[in-house]
């Protein structure tokens, strides 16, 4: 809830679907304590927002006494929280992987909820790689919705059942935003995350953007524009890159700004997940850059290459229908 627009896209769809089940209470737990203004539409779909920071330091502790102490404290805290509810729906994301510091607490959450007898729904996830302990925790969930085929293959290949779907952002009700954008066409957008590229190796030559010898984007026929859908994380990094390379930068702070920017572009190059999805739904070419999240980005690349938007939306509905069906029969 820090303002990443991808979270807004997928959570809006998920919470709207959960609302259709007419629960007595629909609470949303997340961080930070004060959500970013961009998340207002998501917050409006929940009855309450519970400030719920995850213990980032846990993943940094060596196994042993320190880690065991944190695990006991976290387990007691989560048991008190989860015992107030009838089901746990884990919000979409790529955090169930051994390289993500959130994984250790998220996997513990699944185990705690399962021990309480609650249905646990992994709603539209990219999962893995995980060690055997992590896979055992994922196996305890009631249902696992894989938002791309790389995760689906990974889980099924290890004997963990999975429902193949597509990201819920494919079902977001995108609307073309009237009015001119901040950049005059023609332009091609480049979305980059600060932890995926080495800024010192970025260069522009003959209208093309490179990282070392790796071609990132070809702007020979149009202007290259740097952009981000997560201003808190990447705006500062991209501002430095933009100054060094003399490229324009647009930091989108709302879904409307993101849609307007992409709808006027000639296409998107992205190592971020949701700008590529937004481009595909709006009918713009989307090139997915591989990064440090192998299942997530490889899976998205395969989805976009092998399916029409209509097929991707059908796949996403399969996941959404599975979530609703699981909750109807389990509660």
Predicted feature locations:
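Active-site anion-handling motifs in enzyme catalytic cores
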Residues: 1-331
């Amino acid at each position: 809830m820090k303002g990443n627009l991808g979270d807004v896209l997928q959570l809006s769809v998920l919470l709207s679907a959960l609302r259709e089940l007419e629960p007595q209470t629909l609470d949303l737990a997340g961080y930070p304590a004060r959500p970013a203004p961009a998340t207002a539409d998501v917050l409006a779909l929940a009855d309450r927002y519970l400030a719920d920071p995850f213990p980032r330091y846990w993943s940094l502790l060596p196994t042993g006494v320190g880690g065991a102490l944190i695990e006991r404290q976290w387990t007691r805290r989560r048991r008190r929280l989860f015992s107030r509810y009838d089901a746990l729906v884990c919000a979409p994301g790529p955090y169930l992987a051994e390289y993500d510091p959130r994984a250790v607490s998220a996997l513990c959450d699944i185990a705690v909820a399962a021990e309480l007898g609650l249905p646990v729904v992994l709603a539209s996830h990219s999962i893995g790689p995980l060690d055997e302990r992590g896979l055992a925790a994922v196996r305890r969930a009631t249902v696992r919705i894989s938002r791309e085929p790389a995760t689906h293959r990974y889980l099924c290949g290890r004997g963990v059942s999975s429902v193949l779907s597509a990201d819920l952002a494919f079902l977001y009700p995108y609307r073309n935003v009237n009015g001119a954008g901040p950049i005059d066409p023609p332009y091609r957008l480049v979305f980059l995350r600060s932890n995926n590229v080495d800024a010192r190796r970025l260069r522009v030559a003959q209208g093309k953007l490179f990282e070392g010898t790796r071609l990132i984007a070809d702007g020979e026929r149009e202007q290259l524009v740097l952009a981000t859908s997560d201003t808190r994380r990447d705006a500062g990094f991209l501002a430095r890159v933009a100054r060094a390379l003399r490229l324009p930068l647009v930091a989108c702070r709302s879904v409307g700004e993101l849609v307007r920017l992409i709808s006027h572009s000639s296409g998107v190059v992205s190592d971020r997940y949701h700008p590529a999805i937004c481009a595909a739904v709006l009918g713009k070419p989307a090139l997915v850059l591989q990064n440090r999240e192998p299942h997530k980005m490889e899976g998205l690349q395969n989805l976009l290459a092998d399916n029409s938007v209509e097929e991707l939306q059908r796949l996403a509905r399969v996941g959404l229908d599975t979530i609703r069906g699981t909750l109807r029969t389990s509660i």
